[in-house]
Amino acid sequence: MIDLPFLLAEEIEGGLFDFNGTLPLMALQFLTLMVLLNTIFYKPVTKVLDERDEYIRTTLTTASSMLVKADELAAKYEEDLSEARRNAQLKIASSQKEAQNIVSEDIKKAQLNAEKLIAEASKQLNVQKEEALKTLENQVDTLSDQIKVKLLSSQS
């Protein structure tokens, strides 16, 4: 029998690399492995990574455009809201002013009515006063005549 490890031990001269027929075979195996890994593994992984990168980029672009649109809409709604508030305040102010005008007109009418009633009552009181004075004058005249008659009759 041939002792193979012994034969191999004699052939190996030592050193890091042996430049013999196995070196080109190892290089060919390495290059074949690189081509296979590139074809089977690296290209699909690179493709998936590129697709993912493109998806992220388009999603970010879409999200940023949506954010810009949302900001524009928010600004527009804020502007519309402030305009609506301003219009509401103007309507409230005009309604209050109109209500104050109506109330002041009603107060003026009521004052005029009250003044008319007071003037009418004053006239009626003056008329009644005059009538009472005339009645009193007549009664005074009658009483003075009666007193004269009594005085004259008691003197005679």
Swiss-Prot record:
GO terms under cellular component: chloroplast thylakoid membrane; proton-transporting ATP synthase complex
Keywords: ATP synthesis, ATP-binding, CF(0), Chloroplast, Hydrogen ion transport, Ion transport, Membrane, Nucleotide-binding, Plastid, Thylakoid, Transmembrane, Transmembrane helix, Transport
A molecular-function term among this protein's GO annotations: proton-transporting ATP synthase activity, rotational mechanism
Membrane-protein topology: Single-pass membrane protein
Coiled coil: none
CDD domains the record matches: ATP-synt_Fo_b
Localization, UniProt: Plastid, Chloroplast thylakoid membrane
TM regions (residue ranges): 20-42
Superkingdom: Eukaryota
Subunit structure, as described in the record: F-type ATPases have 2 components, F(1) - the catalytic core - and F(0) - the membrane proton channel. F(1) has five subunits: alpha(3), beta(3), gamma(1), delta(1), epsilon(1). F(0) has four main subunits: a(1), b(1), b'(1) and c(10-14). The alpha and beta chains form an alternating ring which encloses part of the gamma chain. F(1) is attached to F(0) by a central stalk formed by the gamma and epsilon chains, while a peripheral stalk is formed by the delta, b and b' chains.
Record's miscellaneous remark: In plastids the F-type ATPase is also known as CF(1)CF(0).
Protein family according to the UniProt entry: Belongs to the ATPase B chain family.
Function: F(1)F(0) ATP synthase produces ATP from ADP in the presence of a proton or sodium gradient. F-type ATPases consist of two structural domains, F(1) containing the extramembraneous catalytic core and F(0) containing the membrane proton channel, linked together by a central stalk and a peripheral stalk. During catalysis, ATP synthesis in the catalytic domain of F(1) is coupled via a rotary mechanism of the central stalk subunits to proton translocation.
Name of the protein this chain belongs to: ATP synthase subunit b', chloroplastic
Organism of origin: Pyropia yezoensis
Gene behind this protein: atpF2
